[in-house]
A protein has these predicted regions:
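Active-site segments of SGNH/GDSL-like serine hydrolases
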Residues: 39-64
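A short, structure-level motif marking secondary-structure boundaries and short turns
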Residues: 25-27, 56, 100
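Surface-exposed alpha-helical segments enriched in charged/polar residues
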Residues: 36-46, 113, 117-120
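Short amphipathic alpha-helical segments, especially helix-boundary/capping motifs
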Residues: 15-18, 45-49, 88-92
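C-terminal regions of proteins
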Residues: 68-123
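A short alpha-helix capping/helix-coil boundary motif
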Residues: 19-22, 49-52, 77
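Acidic-and-aromatic substrate-binding clefts and catalytic sites of carbohydrate-active enzymes
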Residues: 29-32, 60-67
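Secreted/periplasmic serine-hydrolase-like ester/acetyl group-modifying domain
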Residues: 1-44
């Protein structure tokens, strides 16, 4: 059994349409045990000198800023959050997505470049 990830070199799925619908995130869907686990992971990393970077990758839909706002409130200030370039029109082009959640090789190269710049700037 192979593990890990690999680039998707297949052509995008047919009928892929960018989702412009804005979704409002609600805290009512949160489970306290997950919130506690999230806080605990951050604490363990801090105690062990591990720098955390939380990454928001692109999906083939409008960025959920209400979820980001909630997430940002849960992240300890010493940790960092990277959000893909939401203004880059590439992320609205179906040719850079295999499906709604997975980038093609070309899309992954663009996203990886953005992430690399962010990581190098935080050193």
């Amino acid at each position: 059994v192979a593990c890990g990830s690999r680039p998707i070199i297949l052509k995008p799925k047919e009928g892929l349409v960018y989702d412009n619908e804005r979704v409002v995130y609600s805290k009512t869907v949160e489970a306290q045990n997950y919130l506690d686990a999230f806080k605990n992971i951050q604490l363990i990393c801090k105690e062990n000198g591990i720098d955390l970077i939380f990454v928001f990758p692109p999906n083939f839909q409008v960025f959920n800023s209400s979820f980001y706002d909630r997430f940002n409130k849960l992240v300890n200030r010493e940790n960092k959050i990277f959000v893909y370039d939401t203004l880059n029109t590439v992320y609205k082009d179906k040719n850079y997505f295999y499906d709604g959640s997975h980038l093609t090789k070309g899309g992954a190269e663009i996203f990886t470049s953005e992430l690399s710049v962010f990581i190098n700037a935080t050193k």
